[in-house]
C-alpha cells in the first residue's frame, strides 16, 4: 500500500521536473544566442558607426568611411554614400523633432531645427530637444502644475497670451477621440474647459474668427458670411478674391489693435482680418495667409517670436490651423480623415507645449485653444431645390448651403426694390415635409443678432440639420461635411480649453458664447476692451484672480408710484364690464387696488423675489402698480405696462382655476385717463385685439381676477398671436411651474422696429404708430426664473437660479409654424423653443436690468444673464 502510494506520487514529479528542465534549457540557449548576436551586432554596429557612419560627418567632403563610403553632397550621384547617409544627413533636415540618433548631431544648416550640442545657445533647437537629448521630463509626461503664481523666466514680466484656433474642431471630438489626442487631452485635464463654446450664426469660419477677436456679432463687425455683397460698396466679398483685404469690409477693433493701441505688441500667424489694414493698421508682426505652410513651421515661428528680445517681443499671439475643418468637409465628421487630422493637430500642439516647456514658459503663457464652429454630415439625398418652389429662378441670386440667403439677381439696380416678402410667402408651408423655414431677416430669432446690416440679405432660410438648400439640381456639392447651421445644433458646438497662470486648473465650466472671449483676453493682458457685444465679467469664473469686477448697472429713470385717489374712475375710457352692475360693485373691485403697506410688502416678496427690473432707458416716466397676485411697471408714454412680474407656484392640486369673467374691462383708477389706453381702440375693424400681460386666469380666486381686467394690464396683440400667447399661459406655463417647483414670470412688450437688437428710441416708435395712440410691439418677452435646486421655490432660493427666456415675434399670422389644421399642442411649444433667448438679449431689447436684488456676486448674475438654454439632445 505504502509502495503504491510512493510510486503514484513520485512519477508525476519526475515528469514535471523534466519538462521544466527542458524549458529552462531552451530559454537559456535562446538567451545565449540573443546575447551572442547582440554582442556581435553591437560590436559590428559600433565598428560600422566608427568606420562607415555619417553621424557627425554629414557633407564633410574629406570623410572616407568603411570601404571608402562618403557623406558629401555628391555621394548619391556617385553611388558611394555610407549606409546611413539618407537617415542621418537628409531625413534629419526634414523633421521638426529630435530623436536619439540626432542628439549631438553636427549642425546641418538646411535643418528645420537642430539637435546639436550648441542649439540652446543658438536658439534653434527642436521643440523636444531637452526631453529627448537631455533627459528632461516632457510636457506630456509631466504632472499637472498647480502653482498659484506665474512661473515666468527672467524677461517675462507678465504672461504672454496665445490664441490658438483649430478650424472646425467640434466639441464632440474632444470626448469621442480623446485617447488619440494625448496633448490636447492633457490641456483639458490640467486646465479649464467648457463642455462647448457656442459659435455665432452663421456658423462659418470668417464670421466667427472675427467675432472671437472683436467680441462683436457678425451683424456688428460686418463679416456676416464667407461670401456676401454690399450694395453701398457695390462689391462682392469672398475667400477667393482680393476684395477680402479691403478694410471697408472689416468693422470693429480686433484684439491685436486693442493690444497695440495700449502699448503692447501683437503677432498673428494667420487669422481672418490680420492681413488687412483695419483702421489703417496691421499687427506688429503678421504672416500673409498660405495654407501650404506646415503646422510645425507655424509653431516653430511662434516659438521664435517668443525668443525675441523683450523690447521686440509681442505679448499677444494668434495661431490658426485649417484642420480638422478641411478633413471634415472632405470626409464628414465621422471619418478616418478627421481622425487622422485630429492626430496631426494634436502632434503639432504637443510641439508647441514642448517648445514652451523648453523655454520654461509652459506655466507662464496663458494659452486659449478653441474652434470657430463644429461640423455636420451632409447627404446628396437631403437637398432642397428652389426649382421645386418657383417656376423660374433666374430673377434672384442665392447663397446656397446650410445658411442660405436670397437677394435680387440684378444688382445694385434691383437690390432695394426686390420683393423679399413675396419670396418668403412663396416658400412658406409649401410641403408637409419641408426642411427649411423661410424668414424675413428681421423676423429671425433675436438671439442670433443677425439682421441689422445691409450685407445680410432680407430673405433667409433656416435649414434643418444635415440638409442643404440650393438653387437647382445642377448643384452637386453635397456629401462629406458642412457647417453654417443653427448655432444651437450640437454638431455646431466648438471647443474651448485654456491653461496658464491666470486660469483655474482641472475645472469644467458651463458653455458660453464666443463673443465673450475678447473681454477675457483683454483681462489676461490687463488692458481696456473696446466697445463690444460681450458682457464683461461673465467669464470671471474661469480666472483665479479676475482683473475686472463688474457691478450692476445704475438705474437711469427712477420710478414713481401710481397712487390710489378715488375708487370710481373719472372716465370710463370706453370700457365696459356687464358683471359689475352698479357703482357700488365697481367701487368694491377698484378698492382692491388700494393695497396697504403690509400687502405691498407681501406681494413684492412673492412676485418680485429678485427685485424689480431697473429701467436703463433715459426719460422714461413710469410707475409701479401693486396687486396681490402681480406687480407691474407701467410706461406712461406707451400707455401700457413695460413689464409684469408674478410667481406661479407648483400646483399642489389639479383642481381647475376659477373661470375668467368674459368681456369685462374697466379703467384703472390709479392711472390718469390721458396716460391710459381706451378700450375702443380694440373695437375698430382691425386685426388687433387686446391681450393681458398678466393672465386673469392665473388668479387663485374669482374676485382677484378683477385686478387683471383693467386697462393698465392691456397690451395690443394680433388675433393669431394671442392664440399662441393664451395657450402658453394656460398650458405651458403650468407645465414649467410643475417641473421646476414654481416659476417667477416677468413678461412685457418689445419695440425693435429698426431690428438692431436694442430698444427703440421714442421717435423711432412714433414713426410706426400708424395714426393710432397705442404702438404695436414688434415682440413680446417672457422670462421664467426658478431655483436650480428644485427643492426650493423661487421666492426662497438660496443659491443659483435657472432661467428660460423667450422673445417671440409679434406678427399677424402664425405661418412660421404652418399651423393650418393643427391644434396648439402640436406647434406652440415648438415656436417658443425656436425663439429661446438669453436674459441679456431681453435686457438689450427692453432697456431693463434684472436680478439686482438677488444676493449673489454680480459676475455670477452675469453668467446667468448670458446663459442660453438649449433643447438639442443629439448630434
Swiss-Prot record:
Function: Hydrolase that metabolizes extracellular nucleotides, including ATP, GTP, UTP and CTP. Limits mast cells and basophils response during inflammation and during the chronic phases of allergic responses by eliminating extracellular ATP, a signaling molecule activating these cells in an autocrine manner. Metabolizes extracellular ATP in the lumen of the small intestine, and thereby prevents ATP-induced apoptosis of intestinal plasmacytoid dendritic cells.
Residues annotated as catalytic: 205
PROSITE patterns: SMB_1 (PS00524), SMB_2 (PS50958)
Cofactor(s) in the UniProt record: Zn(2+)
Post-translational modification: N-glycosylated. N-glycosylation is necessary for normal transport to the cell membrane, but is not the apical targeting signal.
Tissue expression summary: Detected on bile ducts in liver, and in blood serum (at protein level). Detected in prostate and uterus. Detected on basophils, but not neutrophils.
Spans within the Cytoplasmic topological domain: 1-11
Protein encoded by which gene: ENPP3
Induction notes from the record: Up-regulated by stimulation by allergen or by cross-linking with IgE. The IgE-mediated activation is enhanced by tetradecanoyl phorbol acetate (TPA), a stimulator of the PKC pathway, and inhibited by the P13 kinase inhibitors, LY294002 and wortmannin. Up-regulated in invasive bile duct cancers.
Biophysicochemical property: pH dependence: Optimum pH is between 8.5 and 9.0.
UniProt binding sites for Zn(2+) 2: 325, 329, 483
Domain SMB as annotated: residue spans: 50-93, 94-138
Broad EC category: hydrolase
PANTHER family in the record: ECTONUCLEOTIDE PYROPHOSPHATASE/PHOSPHODIESTERASE, ECTONUCLEOTIDE PYROPHOSPHATASE_PHOSPHODIESTERASE FAMILY MEMBER 3
Protein name: Ectonucleotide pyrophosphatase/phosphodiesterase family member 3
Annotated GO biological process: ATP metabolic process; basophil activation involved in immune response; negative regulation of inflammatory response; negative regulation of mast cell activation involved in immune response; negative regulation of mast cell proliferation; nucleoside triphosphate catabolic process; phosphate ion homeostasis; phosphate-containing compound metabolic process
Cofactor binding remark: Binds 2 zinc ions per subunit.
Oligomeric and partner information: Monomer and homodimer.
InterPro entries referenced in this protein's UniProt entry, alphabetically: Alkaline_phosphatase_core_sf (IPR017850), DNA/RNA_non-sp_Endonuclease_sf (IPR044929), Endo_G_ENPP1-like_dom (IPR001604), ENPP1-3/EXOG-like_nuc-like (IPR020821), His-Me_finger_sf (IPR044925), Phosphodiest/P_Trfase (IPR002591), Somatomedin_B-like_dom_sf (IPR036024), Somatomedin_B_dom (IPR001212)
Binding site for ATP: 204, 226, 275, 289
Cellular component annotations (GO), alphabetically ordered: apical plasma membrane; external side of plasma membrane; extracellular exosome; perinuclear region of cytoplasm; plasma membrane
Enzymatic reactions: a ribonucleoside 5'-triphosphate + H2O = a ribonucleoside 5'-phosphate + diphosphate + H(+); ATP + H2O = AMP + diphosphate + H(+); CTP + H2O = CMP + diphosphate + H(+); GTP + H2O = GMP + diphosphate + H(+)
Binding-site positions, Zn(2+) 1: 167, 205, 372-373
Membrane-related topology note: Single-pass type II membrane protein
